[in-house]
Amino acid sequence: MFKNAFSNLQKIGRSLMLPVSVLPIAGILLGIGSANFKIIPHTISNIMTEAGSSVFSNMPLIFAIGIALGFTKNDGVSALAAVVSYGIMTKTLSITIPIFSNLSDINVNQKYLLDTGILGGIIAGSISAYIFNTFYRIQLPEYLGFFAGRRFVPIASGLISIIFGCILSIIWPPIGNVIKTFSEWAAYQNPTLAFGIYGTVERALVPFGLHHIWNVPFQMQIGEYNNSIGQIFHGDIARYMAGDSTAGKLSGGFIFKMYGLPFAALAMWHCANKKNKAKIGGIMMSGALTAILTGITEPIEFSFILVAPILYVIHAILAGLAFPICILLNMRSGTSFSHGLIDFIVLSGNSNNFWLFPIVGLFYGILYYGIFYFMIKKFNLKTPGREKSITYINQKTIKETALLVISILGGKTNIINLDACITRLRITVLDISKVNQKKLKNLGASGVIVSGSGIQIVFGTQSDHIKTEIDNYMSNTNQ
C-alpha cells in the first residue's frame, strides 16, 4: 500500500514539472516588466508585464493540463478534457456555493470561497486523467459511434465535473478557510518559522522526488496581492514579480544553492584521495558551476546523500535556516525556476538589500565548507574520491548513454513507463530484479532511488535528453 501511494505521489510530482516549466519565461517577463527599468520603453514594459501576468493568472488551468498529461502519457485529448473539466467545475462551484453555504451573494471578503486555485486545477486534471484512462477505448452503439473512444473523454469529464463542482461547493468552504488561514500565517504572521520549515522539508523530500508537491503551496498559493489595475496574484513567486513588498521570502534558496553547496563540493574535492583529486575536481566543479548558474543542485547532493547521509541531514537543516536568516535581515529577491545566478540578476528589480546576498552567502559557504570538511575527515566518510575502489567510465554521448540505460534496466520490454523531470529519469519497470543499480552509477548517474517497481536515476540536466533518446529508440520497432 505504501509503495503504491509513494508511486502515485511520484507521478504527481512528475506531472507538476510541466506547468512549473513555464515559470521561467513568465517570471522573467513579469519581473522585468514590473520593475520599470528606465532603459526599457514604457510600452515594452507593459507588454512584458501583461504577458507574464497572463501565465500566472491562468496557473490553475495550466496545472490542470499538466496533471492530465502526466497521468496519460502526454495524450492531447486528456489536455482538452482538463480544460473542459476545469471550466465546468469552477462555473458550477460559483453557482452552487452561495446555495449550499446559505449565502445570497459572495462579498469581497469571501471571494476565496470561489477560488480553488492550484488545487482546483489539480482536481480537474485528475478527473480528466482518470476518465481518459478508463474510457478512451469505450464502444458505443453505432448511432452514437462519433462520440466513442477518445471523443467520449471530454464529454464525460465535463459531466463528472458538474458533480464534483456540487460536491466541492459543500466541502470547499471549510477547506478554503483552512487554506486562507495557513496562507496568512505563512505569508504575513510568522513567515520566519513557516519558511524555515519549508526549506528543511523541501530538501528532505528531494531524494524521493516529492519536493515539487511541497513547493506548490508556498510558491503558488500563499498570500494575495492586488496590483494597481486590479489583477490578483497568489504565491510568493507571482507576488514578488508583481511588486508585492511582502513577498520574496524564498530568497534563502540563493544562499545555500549559489554559495553553500558549491563550497561543500569544494570541501569534498579537497578531502578526496590524492590519486582521485583531478577526476573529483572536475566532477565537483562542474556540479558547483551548475548550482551557481542555474540553482540545480542534485548533481552535488546525490554525490554524498547515499554514501554519507549524515551530511545530507546537516545540509537540509542548513538549507532550512537560510530562509529565516534572509527574512530576518529583510533580504528579498525573486525566483522563477530555481535559485541561480540567472534568476538572481534578471529578477533583481524588486529586490531588497541586494548587496547583502554575497556577504551572507560567503559566510554560509565557509560554514558549509568547514562542516563538510570536518565531518568527512573526522568520521572518514566515503564521499567521492575516498572509496577504496572507484570506477569512472569515459564520457559517452547522450544516445550511447540512453542505449546503455535501456540495457541496464533489463531491456525495453522491462520498461513500463518512462518520464523525466529537470534532473532525473523516473521509470516504472516490470521486474525490478533485472535492474543493475551499480552499472547505472558507473554510467554516471549521481544517484539511484528504488521504491517498489519505480526507479529514479539522477543524470542532472541531461535527464530529459536521455529520456528523449530512449523514447525514440523504444518507438522504433526496427531497432
UniProtKB/Swiss-Prot annotation:
Catalysis: reaction(s): N(pros)-phospho-L-histidyl-[protein] + D-glucose(out) = D-glucose 6-phosphate(in) + L-histidyl-[protein]
Residue intervals of the PTS EIIC type-1 domain: 1-388
Taxonomic superkingdom: Bacteria
Broad enzyme group: transferase
Keyword Transferase: yes
Residues spanning the membrane: 15-35, 51-71, 80-100, 112-132, 152-172, 252-272, 280-300, 305-325, 356-376
Matches recorded under Pfam families: PTS_EIIB (PF00367), PTS_EIIC (PF02378)
A Gene Ontology cellular-component term: plasma membrane
Main subcellular location of this protein, as a coarse class: membrane
PROSITE patterns linked: PTS_EIIB_TYPE_1, PTS_EIIB_TYPE_1_CYS, PTS_EIIC_TYPE_1
Membrane topology type: Multi-pass membrane protein
Protein EC: 2.7.1.199
Subcellular location: Cell inner membrane
Active site: C421
Key words of the record: Cell inner membrane, Cell membrane, Kinase, Membrane, Phosphoprotein, Phosphotransferase system, Sugar transport, Transferase, Transmembrane, Transmembrane helix, Transport
Single annotated GO MF: protein-N(PI)-phosphohistidine-sugar phosphotransferase activity
GO biological process: D-glucose transmembrane transport; phosphoenolpyruvate-dependent sugar phosphotransferase system
Stored NCBIfam families: EIIB_glc, PRK11089.1, PTS-II-BC-glcB
Job description of the protein: The phosphoenolpyruvate-dependent sugar phosphotransferase system (sugar PTS), a major carbohydrate active transport system, catalyzes the phosphorylation of incoming sugar substrates concomitantly with their translocation across the cell membrane. The enzyme II complex composed of PtsG and Crr is involved in glucose transport.
Notes on the domains: The EIIB domain is phosphorylated by phospho-EIIA on a cysteinyl or histidyl residue, depending on the transported sugar. Then, it transfers the phosphoryl group to the sugar substrate concomitantly with the sugar uptake processed by the EIIC domain. The EIIC domain forms the PTS system translocation channel and contains the specific substrate-binding site.
The name this protein goes by in its record: PTS system glucose-specific EIICB component
Native source species: Buchnera aphidicola subsp. Baizongia pistaciae (strain Bp)
